[in-house]
């Protein structure tokens, strides 16, 4: 009977231990939940206290460590967050969140080399974590490593095509490399996602600057085209000529009408202005898409839509009168898949 007694005693002990462990886990989850709610209310010290209670019960809690770091960063103490993030990474080495936040902290603290180190470590650990590619693109851009910024932005777009900021950093990086056609299509892609946000006017300013690059109206019927020496052998060469010819024989055009004609003419030669022979992604995702758009009959609606931040009242009135055109454009967007 002694072995049986010992077995029963052991089973009872295990049952008690499992129950206690389960209760502790539930308590930790509840404390973290309370901490998150307090953080959302801006009660950062109270939130941190809740996380500290959770960590006393379960020091190996990934969520408690990560949320502590998140709240410390929100509180304005990002460097204090790093030890908690390092702990979180040790607990879950394949999670991209921790690497991403540490990278952000170092980048904000003007330590780009450390930021790049953690973004790269994060990419190695979590290769499908989209924000790592976006953030490393931003850091590369800040370091004037525009080729690397473009490449990372492309990966970020592949992982999340609807992430407007990735479209934006692609447009900025290509612009810095004087790839004006690719930059134009990047900005237009951004504006398809964010036609009316605080960032939209800046994007539209870039678009207009690219379209008007080298083109100067010198009189009512005269235009001067200036070709920069660095554009003589590049994909930018045809852009000012195309833009000028698009409206040269037209009269009494509104700003949006002119823009529509200019967009259409440029998109029709999208593969030329992007010089995408050696960049399959740009050729498929950008050039093919915008070339199809130019031929779709939806250019007026497209132009009105992406220029809402500049001509809001006029464009909204146009959409009210042309609701079928807006619906047709929306249907076309849904039906037209952008390939990588």
Label every PLM stretch briefly.
Residues 26-60, 67-74, 104, 108-111:
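Alpha-helical segment of the N-proximal tetratricopeptide repeat
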Residues 27-29, 62-63, 96-97, 130-131, ...:
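Helix-start (N-cap) detector for alpha-helical repeat units in TPR-like alpha-solenoids
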Residues 33, 67-70, 100-101, 135, ...:
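Canonical tetratricopeptide repeat
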Residues 40-41, 74-76, 108-109, 142-143, ...:
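Register position in tetratricopeptide repeats
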Residues 53-54, 87-88, 121-122, 155-156, ...:
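Canonical positions in the second alpha-helix
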């Amino acid at each position: 009977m002694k072995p049986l007694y010992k077995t029963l005693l052991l089973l009872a002990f295990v049952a008690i231990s499992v129950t206690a462990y389960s209760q502790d886990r539930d308590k930790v989850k509840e404390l973290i939940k309370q901490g998150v709610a307090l953080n959302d209310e801006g009660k950062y010290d109270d939130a941190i206290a809740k996380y500290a209670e959770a960590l006393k019960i379960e020091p190996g809690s990934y969520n408690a460590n990560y949320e502590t770091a998140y709240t410390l960063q929100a509180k304005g103490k990002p460097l204090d967050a790093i030890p908690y993030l390092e702990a979180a990474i040790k607990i879950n080495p394949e999670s991209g969140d921790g690497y991403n936040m540490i990278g952000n902290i170092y980048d904000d603290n003007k330590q780009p080399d450390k930021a790049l180190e953690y973004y790269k470590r994060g990419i190695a650990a979590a290769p499908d974590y989209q924000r790592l590619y976006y953030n490393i693109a931003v850091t590369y851009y800040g370091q004037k490593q525009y080729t690397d910024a473009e490449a990372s932005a492309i990966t970020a777009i592949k992982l999340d095509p609807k992430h407007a900021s990735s479209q934006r950093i692609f447009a900025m990086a290509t612009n810095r490399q004087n790839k004006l056609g690719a930059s134009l299509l990047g900005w237009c892609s951004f504006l398809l996602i964010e036609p009316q946000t605080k960032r939209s006017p800046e994007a539209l300013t870039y678009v207009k600057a690219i379209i008007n690059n080298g083109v100067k109206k010198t009189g009512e019927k005269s235009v001067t085209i200036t070709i920069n020496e660095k554009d003589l052998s590049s994909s930018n060469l045809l852009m000012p000529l195309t833009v000028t010819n698009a409206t040269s024989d037209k009269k009494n055009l509104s700003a949006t009408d002119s823009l529509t004609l200019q967009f259409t003419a440029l998109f029709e030669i999208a593969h030329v202005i992007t010089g995408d022979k050696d960049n399959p992604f740009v050729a498929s995702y950008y050039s093919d898409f915008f070339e199809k758009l130019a031929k779709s009959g939806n250019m007026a609606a497209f132009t009105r839509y992406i220029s809402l931040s500049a001509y809001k009242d006029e464009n909204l009135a146009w959409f009210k009168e042309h609701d079928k055109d807006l619906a047709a454009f929306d249907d076309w967007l849904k039906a037209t898949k952008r390939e990588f």
